[in-house]
Structure formats: structure tokens, C-alpha cells
């Protein structure tokens, strides 16, 4: 078979169109995005909200976002690095922390809309599937889950954040088959396993296992827990207190920043015209004075 080199003509380059920048960077799935933001044409000026969850190495970001021509508008946001204010100082990126972040965002956005008393959600997290029921006065706040580019595997942390938002009182279309504890064989959600994940039971079980088998590994893997005095038996109670604290005061707390430190100046301060003028006069006077002293010495000799 003869090898034929493919030649791109002038017309090819003339008609070539590059893909969107965020597609070229591999950051946005536009096929999924267009299905999330497309609004019915008979709904005018009605935003379609997305419940956006993203994970970094040390943080969890949860946002309520709506799309506009000018760009995406963030209505409310919650971060895992806010959780130490509510009593959770360790394990800020696991399934239980994702649940807390989703719960915090749900309570925050409902308080912003003055719907927090009307839609309390599921106060006691049992691990069972929960969907908010509409009341007679106002419909529940509806958003669509935006997972980005992650693999939506069963038990993924993003579904922990989803469960937190659902228990917080948001209306998000979902299925229970991706929550931790869902069995593929009998197609049923084991609520006890899911509850275990929500309250950090998987973390405490691993701590106990390492404590029995590999104490040295426990010291390295859970050094932050040991330093803060968090024990395996107290983890569930800690998360219960965090959930209660979030419901009590979900609003963002501004941190008090210390005054900036005054740095030593190494460059000379720029003088004004008057200061330069006075400095010159003083120098001239000093030179004249020095010249007069020399004349007096010559006369004495």
C-alpha cells in the first residue's frame, strides 16, 4: 500500500476554527454545560441555577451559580476552609466534610432568600434519601448538580456535598444510586452505611484499624488529628456539633485582619520643591560659614 501524505490546503487553514479556550485547556465540558444552562424559551429573565461542587487538594468549593451573557454569576458560595469556625478543624476534604460544605451552602442561600424557617430540610441525618416537599406559600429553591469533569462513581465525595444540600433544604433532582452505601446487586441504598460516611465513621474505623495493627502509621497518617486531640470515638459527636452549629448561624463570618506591618524604608524619601530649596540654602550657609572660619585662621597667623 502506497503511503500518501495528507496535505492541508490553503482552504483548510482559511476555514479552520479553534475550539473554545476552556475546551482546549480541558477545563469545561461544553456538551454538559449547554444542557445545564439552556432555559425554556417561554421563561423570560428566569435564571437557571446550578449547584457547582469542585475539589482542590486542600479545599472544597460549593457554589450556587447562574449563567448570563456577561458570564456566570455566583449567588452564594461555601468553602471547606470555613468549617473550622464551626468546630471541624481536621479532615476538610473527605466525604463528611463535603456533606458539611453542602449543608452550609444550602442553609446560607435559604437564609439569604428568607426561606430558612420555611424549609428546614432533614435536621437529623439518617443516611436515607431525602427530597424537600413544597409548601403552600413558596416553592423550594431549585438547582441542578454540576459535577464538572469528575467521574461520577458511586460514593464520590461530590454526592456527599449533594446529600448535604438536600438535607439543608434545596430542591435538586437526583437519584440515590450514587450515594455511598448503594448496592448494585439489589439496587438498594443501605442507609446505615451512608450515615456512617456522613458522620465520618469510615475515618474512625480506619483510625482504630491502624491503632491496632500499625501504630507508627497512625502517628503519621493522622498526625493532625492527634495534635488537635481528636480521637476515633469522638468523631461522630464532633460532626453532630458541626451540623448544629451550621444550622444555628450559616452566614459568612468575616475574619479580623491585623494591621499591615510597617516595613523599613531603604530608599530615600522624595523631597518636595520647598524642602530641596531649604536644603540648598542650608548647604550654602554651611559652606559660607566654613569659608569665613578659614579666613579668620589666616588672619591670626
Curated annotation (Swiss-Prot):
Subcellular location: Cytoplasm; Nucleus; Nucleus, Nucleolus; Nucleus, Nucleoplasm
Disordered: annotated span: 247-267
Transmembrane spans: none
InterPro entries the record matches: Rbsml_uL18_euk (IPR005485), Ribosomal_uL18_C_euk (IPR025607)
Keyword Membrane assigned: no
Phenotypic consequence of gene deletion: Moderate reduction in cell number. Abnormal leaf patterning, with the abaxial mesophyll features appearing in the adaxial mesophyll domain. Double mutants oli2 oli7 have further reduced cell number but exhibit also excessive postmitotic cell enlargement in leaves (compensation phenotype). Plant missing both OLI7 and GIF1/AN3 have a strong compensation phenotype.
Basic and acidic residues composition bias: residue spans: 249-261
Keywords carried by this UniProt record: Cytoplasm, Nucleus, Ribonucleoprotein, Ribosomal protein, RNA-binding, rRNA-binding
Gene Ontology BP terms: adaxial/abaxial pattern specification; cell division; leaf morphogenesis; translation
GO cellular component, one term: nucleoplasm
Oxidoreductase listed as a keyword: no
GO molecular function annotations of the record: 5S rRNA binding; mRNA binding; structural constituent of ribosome
Family: Belongs to the universal ribosomal protein uL18 family.
Function, as annotated: Component of the ribosome, a large ribonucleoprotein complex responsible for the synthesis of proteins in the cell. The small ribosomal subunit (SSU) binds messenger RNAs (mRNAs) and translates the encoded message by selecting cognate aminoacyl-transfer RNA (tRNA) molecules. The large subunit (LSU) contains the ribosomal catalytic site termed the peptidyl transferase center (PTC), which catalyzes the formation of peptide bonds, thereby polymerizing the amino acids delivered by tRNAs into a polypeptide chain.
Quaternary structure annotation from Swiss-Prot or TrEMBL: Component of the large ribosomal subunit (LSU).
PANTHER family hit by this protein: LARGE RIBOSOMAL SUBUNIT PROTEIN UL18Y-RELATED, RIBOSOMAL PROTEIN L5-RELATED
Entry protein name: Large ribosomal subunit protein uL18y
Organism: Arabidopsis thaliana (Mouse-ear cress)
Gene name for this UniProt entry: RPL5B
